[in-house]
């Protein structure tokens, strides 16, 4: 039986330049780098992981993927995969010694993946939300969203600027 109910969710880290990534991190670890460099001695960013049948690889990190650092609520895009243990990120802010999660990116403002319909939002703590609707290049501000509300608009980004609501989930 088909359902139009969401089956996946991700906590939203508002960003003026990074779209909401696909829910479900595919790799994680601890960053020992600083600035725009993410370093993890135990990572396999280039090689990924061997599938169970030994016939190929999966979970290779790619430019455009999104790194979340949950403890500081920081997000950055992967600019380049420099080695198995080192990534260059779009912005500084991820701290050494902090845990990170990497998610598949869904493209920038004018570079969205084909077929990306965006996400519904659930707002835990109310306020204003500046969003980029899924089929638009112009952001809009949704005013006075109340606590524990669903936003009836498919969006690809929640902006940090002009957003006062918090505890936001993107539902897919």
Predicted segments — roles?
Residues 26-59, 68-107:
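Small/polar beta-strand repeat architecture
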Residues 1-25, 60, 66, 77-80, ...:
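Surface-exposed, low-hydrophobicity beta-strand/loop segments enriched in small/polar/acidic residues
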